[in-house]
């Protein structure tokens, strides 16, 4: 198993801003005609529990765990796995930081959970204020794609 792994607990997304037009996952779906609607992938939940060697998991990259159609109970299951596997580091990035900040108090934020926000242009720098309020020990900003 590699040291850095994409953990696809959800797949698909929905266009939210101009930055989405450059998303590799979205572009792949356009090219192939694949369904890009948000889908839960519960069969992936146990993946981090299968290896005790420390890994870095990119959580739902190319998707968004905090998309409005992802149920709270499902997000809680994802957090339970992250909390129960402290040997791993988890990187969550979202454009839907408002929802993440509203739900944040419902989760346990162990130190291995890093929260990030995508800010693809100055038009979306307001997302940073929401990120600052998040209870994660490590926060990051993604500027991809930078428009």
Protein language model regions, located:
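Histidine/lysine/aspartate-rich catalytic loop segments that bind and position anionic ligands
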Residues: 117-147
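Conserved Radical SAM active-site core
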Residues: 1-113, 122-124
């Amino acid at each position: 198993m590699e040291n850095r792994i994409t953990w696809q607990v959800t797949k698909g997304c929905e266009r939210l801003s101009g930055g989405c037009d450059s998303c590799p996952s979205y572009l792949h779906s356009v090219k192939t005609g694949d369904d890009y609607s948000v889908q839960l992938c519960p069969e992936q939940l146990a993946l981090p529990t299968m290896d005790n060697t420390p890994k870095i998991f990119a959580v739902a990259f190319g998707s968004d765990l905090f998309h409005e159609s992802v149920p709270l109970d499902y997000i809680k299951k994802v957090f339970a796995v992250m909390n129960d596997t402290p040997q791993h580091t988890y990187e969550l990035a979202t454009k839907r930081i408002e929802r993440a900040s509203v739900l944040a108090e419902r989760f346990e934020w162990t130190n291995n959970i890093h929260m990030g926000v995508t800010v693809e242009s100055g038009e979306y720098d307001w997302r940073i204020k929401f990120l600052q309020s998040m209870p994660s020990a490590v926060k990051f900003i993604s500027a991809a794609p930078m428009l």
